[in-house]
Amino acid sequence: MSDGTVAVGDAPPPADPPEPPGPPPGGGGGGGRHGREPDPHRVGDLVRMFVRGLGQLLVTAGVIVLLFVVYEVYVTNWFAHREQHRVHQALEQEWSKGELALPESGLAALDGHGIANLYIPRFGEDYAWTIVQGTNDADLEKGPGHYDGTQLPGQKGDFALAGHRVGKGEPFLNLDKLRAGDSVVVETQTTWYVYCVIGAGTDHAACDPSAPGASLSNTYADPSGTKVPGREIVSPSDGNVILPVPSDPAVPAQQATVRYLTMTTCHPKFTAAKRMIVHAVLGRTIPKQAKGNGRYDDTIPAQIKALYTEVGN
């Protein structure tokens, strides 16, 4: 008979203790986004890998830049001097045969062909370049180029030249070292032309670079009233500097009375942000002695040799 009590032998076993809570779905406990502690060794490896990759990238970029500089300064110079030698030899052969390369002879000057020789005593006896006709990239890779449409050596107006300052032969590398009164000599088949860099206190007929007070910052008074400086820095788009009267568009070539020489190059070195312009005026003309059959004596006259001894370095 039951009295509502439970016998000891019939008591149910005690329940098992509850299990500890497991990790949330998708990962374990602890810190981190997914409940894991980050492995410090793996993080360090990633940082080292990034730094190593960045270093290799910078080294590669530096090598590329160095190779580019070597190419621009040395390799292009080698190619330019090779082309310059070829152009010079061709011009000398034409002259020796009595063939004139300038339009004044009735022949058209062709782009890329030599038309005259350029000497600047300030830069030493080794400085000698054959001027080519034209100023496009291919022309200027051979040497200083004569701007199409500007006057020829010795003519009234502006005989204007362009040349590279760094690389590709760099004929105008030291254009900034010219002084007021310095001579710039242009040789054609028939004539030597001695231009004088403009400057105050300078006898332009004598080209005296030692004149006291001579300065490129001063100007030459053109009869038109225009003041032409010995040197100026302009923007690349300023084409007025090679007009018949530099920087004076009001004077046409037919009315020009002064014989100018203008040389243009990039400024400052290693950039093309600006253009350096040097202006000179014709001081002396020395005709060559005719030898017959269209040929002329190519002996350097004493007056030209004297310019190298007179220049004050």
Where are these regions (language model features)?
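Terminal targeting segments of Actinobacterial cell-envelope proteins
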Residues: 1-51
